[in-house]
A protein has these predicted regions:
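Alpha-helical membrane-anchoring segments
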Residues: 2-324
């Protein structure tokens, strides 16, 4: 067989394998009540901390409108009554969310409050990304919560869940899709803004490393080493090919993050890898994405489930139909 024939054969086998691999998974899985309950509890803690933060509510103007601030004046967010009201509504909505009642009202309201708080904060002339993923998750879960009611109004019939699946199955699946999709969008924006040269140009990140370290120092003035040492930037600049391999790996991790939807093991390893990526960014650039890391830990890594699986493996034989 000629070389060209071998290449064609390998290509066809690879394409066949890929299509077969894509046929399995990528659908909502069975999620038990206790599993989804723990996720709700953990995520609710993040929502409370986010909406109890007073920073967004100290602004009474929007000098650089962002997002919906172009359409609506949000300067009222700085009035004295707003933050206490948001706190009360947050507690009420979070309680409803945790007990699994009234989510079709609680989740959209939480999503609205999170959107308003993030918008007024990002309308001050600088963009913050630390809370974005919380808002996206709330919007996604709000849509899932409202969907059965929309279906009932539109088709005049109750939306019935497929056998063995619960609403938790859909909440988790579409939350994972939103979280993973946000990283795909990040990779796509890098690709488009660099005209496809992001990986090749990645050694120039050395300049961003120095910039972010200086900004971190001048923000708090408590760590002189951030100014005195630039070893990471020097190493990146002096080792361009290694830099392309390292940063290119992170780029493709983001680009293919939606593989997390295939099944639980893939979700776990994609989640762990993205957390490691954030840890590396924090170590090199002092950019903290704590909320994003915790969301990955809750919805992709899903530690309670794997602890349960480990306990089953140690305590007895694996059941024929695992409780997933």
């Amino acid at each position: 067989m000629s070389k060209s024939g071998s290449v064609v054969t390998c290509f066809r086998k690879g394409k066949t394998w890929l299509f077969e691999w894509l046929k399995v998974g990528f659908v909502p899985e069975v999620v038990t009540g206790w599993e989804w309950f723990l996720m709700r509890v953990f995520f609710s803690g993040l929502v409370i901390r986010h909406l109890f933060d007073a920073d967004p509510f100290r602004y009474d103007s929007q000098p650089s409108p962002n997002g919906i601030a172009h359409l609506v004046d949000l300067s009222w967010m700085g009035e004295d009554w707003v933050h206490p009201t948001f706190k009360v509504l947050t507690i009420v909505c979070v309680v409803l969310f945790v007990i699994g009642r009234g989510c079709f009202v609680a989740l959209p309201l939480l999503a609205l409050m999170s959107t308003l708080a993030g918008t007024i904060e990002n309308s001050q002339g600088a963009i913050k990304h630390s809370h974005n993923l919380i808002t996206l998750v709330l919007i996604t879960q709000g849509i899932v919560a409202v969907w059965p009611w929309v279906h009932r109004l539109r088709y005049r019939e109750v939306w019935r869940l497929p056998e063995k699946l619960t609403m938790g199955s859909y909440y988790l699946y579409y939350t994972q899709a939103m979280v993973a999709g946000s990283y795909v969008i990040a990779a796509l924006s890098k690709f488009l803004n660099s005209k496809g040269l992001w990986v090749w140009n990645s050694p120039y990140i050395a300049l961003d490393l120095v910039k972010s370290q200086r900004q971190a120092y001048y923000r708090y003035l408590d760590d002189p080493s951030l100014v005195e040492s630039a070893w990471a930037a020097v190493w990146v600049a002096n080792h361009p090919w290694f830099s392309r391999m390292i940063f290119g790996g992170s780029f493709f991790l983001e680009a293919f993050a939606l593989i997390a939807l295939k099944n639980r093991p893939w979700a776990f390893w994609i989640g762990v890898s993205l957390i490691a990526l954030h840890r590396g960014i924090f170590y090199l650039m002092h950019l903290h994405f704590g909320y994003s890391e915790l969301i990955l830990l809750i919805f992709l890594c899903n530690i309670p489930y794997w602890m349960w699986r480990l306990g089953r493996r140690i305590g007895g034989p694996e059941p024929h139909t695992p409780l997933t």
